[in-house]
């Protein structure tokens, strides 16, 4: 949208939600560091100065590439089957977490790809501490104080670290239970956390996690999840059922259903993760007016991670292509990657330089403040983080459920 704000075009933005979620900070909503309104901005507020842009609240359920229109259902008044014409189309449906064929686990281990998931997790985490406070049976209390995070990519690592820190923050607010002794188990199927990061950063991240009280369980896979436990299997085949009342899912992703719909409409292929395969210029094969972006796509000849910087650069590339009428190959400029673990703890690579500790943490904070949409949100988040730095407090701990 920003790339087209000065272009001589009419823009129609269609989304089933009326807000944009800054996903990299969703886990801070889940752990009470930030409120929902600080990481989610109304779409109409974002484009309020772009008079050539209109917003439609609805869900895209079909594409007719021959006649160049999309089909929209679930409008606010219940209308279905509305056809929206286009000259150029950009599809950026994102992705969702994959439960590897066990969608029933989602009821017991919510994900962090959505604002609803983050708010659900916040309620579950805070309610777990409340339940532990009144539980007299020691085994049941331990289960309430055991938190399992599945997946040790950046989101899983950040979530595990934040839950551990939350336990330390709350210890003076409870009388019958020591929240700082909460167990946080980080389950990862591979041999290291942050497997996409270069050595020695995964090992440094593991050390920092352990210092916070997180227990990494590596080379371990999840076999089953229910409301009261998580069953895991280690590399030697042995199985263990862990009593735990709170689980978080951050393992594996699959493309948005829009990828499959678009691929079917174009007669093109998808990969194993359900992502539509697009040309190097980000257009759909045979349709130079249709662009697909972000982690719902696989670009021919390129291996790109499903992270926000990739999608942002792809968005700018598509906007330039539409304005100039050109179709040049997309080239990703990798500026690095950072993962925060906790207070003054982080690891990352920036411009080829490997960083860890306070410097990496400060860079992470600065970069994420910069990418937030809206001056007001940047100011509020900066103020909250500054307050938290000096007091270790968390001001967004209201239970809604």
Predicted regions and their residues:
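FAD-binding core/adjacent interface of flavoenzyme oxidoreductases
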Residues: 53-148, 237, 248
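Rossmann-like dinucleotide-binding core of oxidoreductases
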Residues: 141-197, 201-207, 215-217, 307-321, ...
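Cofactor-binding loop segments of dinucleotide-utilizing enzymes, especially the Rossmann-like FAD-
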Residues: 15-16, 93, 152, 189, ...
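A Rossmann-like FAD-binding core segment of flavoenzymes
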Residues: 55-72, 76-77, 164-280, 286
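Short glycine-rich anion-binding loops that position phosphate/pyrophosphate groups of nucleotides
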Residues: 94-97, 160, 253-255
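C-terminal, flexible cofactor-proximal segment of oxidoreductases
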Residues: 310, 314, 319-401
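Beta1-alpha1 glycine-rich phosphate/pyrophosphate-binding loop at the start
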Residues: 1-62, 147, 154-197, 248
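FAD-site-proximal beta/loop scaffold in flavoenzymes
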Residues: 108-136, 229, 241-313, 320
């Amino acid at each position: 949208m920003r790339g087209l704000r000065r272009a001589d075009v009419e823009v129609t933005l269609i989304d089933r939600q009326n807000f944009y979620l800054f996903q990299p900070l969703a886990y801070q909503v889940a752990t009470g560091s930030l409120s929902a309104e600080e990481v989610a901005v109304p779409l109409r507020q974002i484009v309020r100065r772009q008079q050539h842009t209109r917003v439609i609240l609805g869900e895209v359920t079909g594409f007719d590439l021959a006649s160049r229109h999309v089909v929209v259902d679930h409008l606010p008044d219940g209308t279905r089957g509305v056809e929206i014409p286009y000259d150029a189309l950009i599809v950026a449906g994102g992705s969702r977490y994959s439960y590897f064929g066990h969608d029933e686990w989602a009821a017991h281990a919510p994900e962090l790809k959505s604002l609803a998931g983050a708010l659900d997790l916040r309620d579950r985490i805070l309610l777990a501490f409340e339940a532990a406070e009144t539980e007299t049976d020691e085994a049941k209390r331990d289960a309430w104080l055991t938190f399992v995070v599945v997946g040790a990519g950046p989101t899983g690592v950040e979530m595990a670290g934040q839950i551990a820190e939350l336990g330390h923050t709350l210890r003076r607010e409870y009388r019958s239970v020591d929240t700082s002794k909460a167990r946080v188990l980080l389950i990862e199927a591979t041999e290291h956390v942050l497997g996409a990061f270069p050595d020695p950063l995964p090992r440094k991240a593991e050390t920092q996690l352990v210092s916070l009280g997180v227990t990494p369980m590596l080379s371990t896979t999840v076999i089953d999840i229910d409301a009261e436990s998580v069953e895991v299997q280690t590399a030697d085949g042995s199985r263990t059922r862990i009593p735990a009342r709170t689980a978080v899912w951050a393992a594996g992703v699959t493309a948005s259903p829009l990828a499959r719909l678009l691929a079917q409409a174009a007669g093109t292929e998808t990969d194993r993760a359900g992502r539509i395969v697009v040309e190097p210029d980000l257009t759909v094969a045979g349709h130079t007016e249709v662009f697909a972006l972000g982690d719902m796509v696989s670009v021919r000849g390129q291996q790109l991670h499903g992270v926000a910087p990739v999608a942002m650069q792809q968005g700018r590339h598509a906007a330039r292509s539409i304005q100039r009428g050109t179709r040049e190959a997309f080239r990703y400029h990798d500026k690095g990657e950072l993962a925060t673990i906790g207070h003054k703890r982080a690891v990352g690579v920036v411009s080829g330089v490997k960083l860890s500790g306070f410097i990496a943490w400060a860079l992470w904070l600065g970069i994420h403040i910069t990418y937030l949409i809206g001056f007001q949100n940047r100011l509020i988040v900066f103020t909250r983080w500054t307050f938290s730095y000096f007091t270790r407090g968390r001001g967004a701990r209201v239970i809604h459920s």
